[in-house]
Amino acid sequence: MSWQAYVDDHLMCDIDGHHLTAAAILGHDGSVWAQSSTFPKFKPEEITAIMKDFDEPGSLAPTGLHLGGTKYMVIQGEGGAVIRGKKGSGGVTVKKTSQALVFGIYEEPLTPGQCNMIVERLGDYLIDQGL
């Protein structure tokens, strides 16, 4: 299966008639493996800061998580494994695997829990596959 199919079929999937606003799978170096057409154009330093928070959980808390120029308030995640951010009625979930970062961005009516489930389920699958 291509990386794009993982984004299209697994991350941008339909849940009760709704889906993520945007999604992507990136390498730890910030290289794009696949992304939805709606995924924001991000800066390399934004991915570097996200990777740093996985190594040093809490490092993004004072500044927020930035992605494509949008600032998300960092909320509880799983240190070294999942970072979650909130902005207004939406937010972002980032799951780290051994080689990739899986991103999901959502807006209401999708809930944070639904976004977490979508992103973390694919991330856990990739981890199980050694990726």
Swiss-Prot record:
Pfam families according to UniProt: Profilin
Signal peptide annotation: none
Regions annotated as coiled coil: none
Cytoplasm as UniProt keyword: yes
Keywords carried by this UniProt record: Actin-binding, Allergen, Cytoplasm, Cytoskeleton
Subcellular location(s) per record: Cytoplasm, Cytoskeleton
Record-level Gene Ontology MF annotations: actin monomer binding
SUPFAM superfamilies the record matches: Profilin (actin-binding protein) (SSF55770)
Record PROSITE patterns: PROFILIN
The keyword Cytoplasm appears for this protein: yes
Gene3D superfamilies documented for this protein: Dynein light chain 2a, cytoplasmic
GO cellular-component term (any): cell cortex
Principal subcellular localization: cytoplasm
InterPro entries: PFN (IPR048278), PFN_euk (IPR005455), PFN_sf (IPR036140), Profilin_CS (IPR027310)
Subunit-level organization: Occurs in many kinds of cells as a complex with monomeric actin in a 1:1 ratio.
Annotated function: Binds to actin and affects the structure of the cytoskeleton. At high concentrations, profilin prevents the polymerization of actin, whereas it enhances it at low concentrations. By binding to PIP2, it inhibits the formation of IP3 and DG.
Family, as annotated: Belongs to the profilin family.
The protein's name in its UniProt record: Profilin
Species this chain originates from: Pyrus communis
